[in-house]
């Protein structure tokens, strides 16, 4: 199943689903699917929405900020809630705003810790289900650390992820050209770590990937860029 940004995805049949806010606001559709529990990773805009959902669904509300400076330390709480709901046969829907980053991160954390999939296997499994998945690099770094902890290896490190994302965004540009610019920027920021930290904090972005995108646009032009609905070009890095 290939998903669009409007769709939800079934990760485990009749047990675990994830996607965006749009479905979370459609009570009739949730009931049609059989959803009984919800994890909201963005927080409700007002208490009335929270009360409405609480009447019909078991709810875990986590207000998670989606930036490269944030990590995934919160994910264990979400995974424990998933365990509890699956144990009592309550199908659960995990969502963030667009179903790209926060919800995908929690699902990958679940697949790694409960299904014993490596980070690489978890990531590409979700990409097959929902091709717009693109967590920010802060969450990716946390999943890389989890990969090392669980499997004593990095099956897919931050450079692998960044290069994959860049190649996906610029499919008409030679991979070697992308890697050359990425490696140049990585070397520059490794040698200027104070500047790296300053830009990361000032712009709330991942400087290496962000700068590489800008360099690619400047060198090759926007006509080489793939326009993807639901996920901005810089999203994984800002």
Model-derived features with residue positions:
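Short, amphipathic alpha-helical interaction segments embedded in low-complexity terminal/linker regions
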Residues: 153-238
């Amino acid at each position: 199943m290939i998903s669009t940004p409007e769709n939800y995805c079934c990760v485990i049949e009749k047990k675990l689903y994830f996607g965006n806010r749009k479905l979370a606001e459609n009570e009739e559709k949730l009931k049609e699917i059989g959803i009984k529990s919800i994890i909201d990773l963005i927080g409700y805009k007002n208490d009335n929405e929270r009360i409405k959902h609480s009447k019909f669904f078991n709810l875990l509300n986590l207000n998670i900020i989606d930036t490269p400076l944030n990590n995934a330390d919160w994910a264990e709480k979400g995974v424990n809630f998933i365990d509890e709901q699956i144990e009592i046969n309550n199908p659960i829907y995990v969502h963030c705003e667009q179903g790209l980053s926060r919800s995908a991160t929690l699902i990958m954390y679940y697949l790694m810790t409960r299904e014993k999939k490596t980070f690489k296997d978890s990531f590409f499994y979700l990409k097959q289900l929902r091709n717009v998945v693109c967590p920010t690099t802060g969450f990716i770094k946390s999943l890389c650390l989890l990969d090392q902890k669980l499997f004593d290896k990095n099956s897919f490190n931050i450079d692998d992820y960044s290069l994959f994302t860049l190649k996906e965004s610029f499919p008409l540009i030679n991979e070697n050209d992308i890697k050359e610019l990425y490696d140049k920027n990585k070397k520059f920021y490794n040698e200027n770590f104070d500047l790296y930290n300053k830009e990361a904090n000032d712009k709330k972005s991942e400087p290496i990937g962000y700068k590489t995108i800008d360099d690619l646009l400047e060198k090759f032009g926007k006509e080489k860029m793939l326009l993807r609905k639901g996920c901005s070009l810089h999203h994984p890095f800002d």
